[in-house]
């Protein structure tokens, strides 16, 4: 037996023994009927569920899983068999970690060291968009204890600057914290835990991606391994000495298609492309990205702070704040304006008023960007404008919330001390606009107005009239008023059988792609993810069925889906990928539909959580009665139009109801003459079971009670 396979089998046997003992101890302590589950997931023990189809619900379900684990450890002198033993280690790690949640207060809640443990389903779904757009180009797993903490911190910071999502296991967590690495889900540097078994929590992220986005069926191990290898851009870095358990865990990663880079010399035990040494930490990042085939588009900007999507979630507390621009205290606005070519001076950057080094804490800020180009259209102004929020947030030490004339920007003391000034904000806008919108923008000029009088004049005389004009245009834009819709296949890198059809009244289910966005995407990249669908061959106006849409869907999904309707949830509903903001599902007792947002973790009157509802669709599957969609679609006049429209909505979580309430009430008033329609819609503060829901609807005389049966 080779040294490598000997280490793998030794580690898998050790984990198998620990797992069996831990299961027996737990059953002796709590009993076989004691419930066990990871928090906020519809996929039970995800590794076991995906590989075998077994739904672990109680401790009594685990001994059989231990038996499966042992069967994978054959001790044969064969690398493929040894990799299976690595999968056995993954199963064992999942069981050991799962047992930590058998306690009333799980081990991660009690831990004195940082580590989030299990990653809930909603977080994975929220990562769908940044993964498919490339904002998160890859996933790194960093584990162990480096001989030099500064070295591993540099590696993690490098990943962070490149947008790579990094999960950490072991002493590297403290080493990075001591070196000043900023951590947290929002910063995409995530400490999982100290035990090596905690690595399973990133493994289950990859596995649930296959179930959520890829429609891989539970029990299809071959399909699972194919999906993770081809579609999940993950890799592993180990630091410091490695024992047989770490080697065995690495074998499990390799079986999933994730290459492992270690910082010790493995000599002849290396497996080219799968297990390689890199003893020079300065080369670790380059080697890892090359092995996984991840290409990073470098953004070298003339600014003194790091710039990456990983900083988009950074929170700047008041105590850490140097200056602030906030509409509650001063005039603020952001506007992109199209001009003629001779009216724009390319790369002209103007700061009109005091810069942030004048000593004040708060300032006015009117951001005006003039753009010109032969292919530029006024409709693209708002598309570019909405990107300002992301670009400012990409700067380390900057926090931006809101848009238009209602926003808040904070700059940290640390960023200020590094030299960040308003000129750098202007540089970011110029470089990002001319890079990302180069197909339509030939010249770009940026003005940042901090003079309060001039900023107010710009807001009143230029910005507000432009906002109002756009709003009037959007309000008049309906599916009937345009001659084409657009496909969006951004999510196909994760969900190959899914394709969105984006219309003026139905944005992409992720909530991030409007009809104007799709139109701009097509203009920027005619061969890209959004393609026009000429609105021809209407077969059924009620359901929104078109021959051209069906042809486009069949082509975009490579025949996986042949027909969709745009306005029905019961007849060939549009498919979903998995990163939808909300899901609507039938509630038979009331003859209506519930709408649930992914942030809601509680029970619904349908008897299912969001995750359980979402498992009914996703991955390009059409399930009549269930449909993923964006938040803004809820108040659309086209929302489940074929089934009667929004008057079928009977329940939604309070946070969602409050968010869409104003728009939803306006639509209900226009369509049905109903005032305050949301008062007729129940939420979790009123009921979470179907009997109480029906009683509430009867009390409110909800219009759904008089509609035709759905089935």
Which ranges hold each PLM region?
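Cysteine-centered metal-binding/redox modules
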Residues: 24, 28-31, 44, 48-49, ...
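Acidic, serine/proline-rich low-complexity intrinsically disordered regions
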Residues: 1-389, 407-408, 566-573, 668-669
